[in-house]
Amino acid sequence: MSKKNLQYFMRSTQQEVVTVPGPESFKDEEGKVIDFEIKVLSQAEIMKINDMYRTHRPTRDKKGNPLVMNNEIVWETERDSARASRHLIVEALQYPDLKDPDLMKHYNCVDITEMPLRVFPRADEYQFVTRIVMQALGLMSDENADNAEIEDAKN
């Protein structure tokens, strides 16, 4: 048996940046689709952002008293997954930088989680950007690859 070497698990800490074509509605002076740059976030960063939009509080009865079951307080957890996913988009997109103060001022926006909705106001643009970012982060599978696998399985 070969010697176990932990060197294989010592990965580079440099962040990976993926370049993908943006939506058809964003073109440069020459009419070419603008490329978006997406930083691949670590699982720890993704979990930290998701935890920011999770609230944990005691469940209350109709009188406003905490609900107790088996001598323990029953906790209620609420998640704002839409806002968390918009925050993930902002953190992952390097170009366009949605946290840029000039861009935020242009859209009269003070909350970074509102920027994806302002910069990509059309539903098709927003869905496209959400899909490419989530695929780059590994949170969503590539539909084309899935369809190809299904076609291969059929044949």
Label each residue range with its predicted role.
Residues 1-14, 148-155:
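Low-complexity intrinsically disordered segments
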Residues 10-27:
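Short acidic, Pro/Gly- and aromatic-enriched capping/linker segments at domain boundaries
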Residues 30-155:
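Short, surface-exposed, charged amphipathic helix/loop patches that serve as local interaction elements
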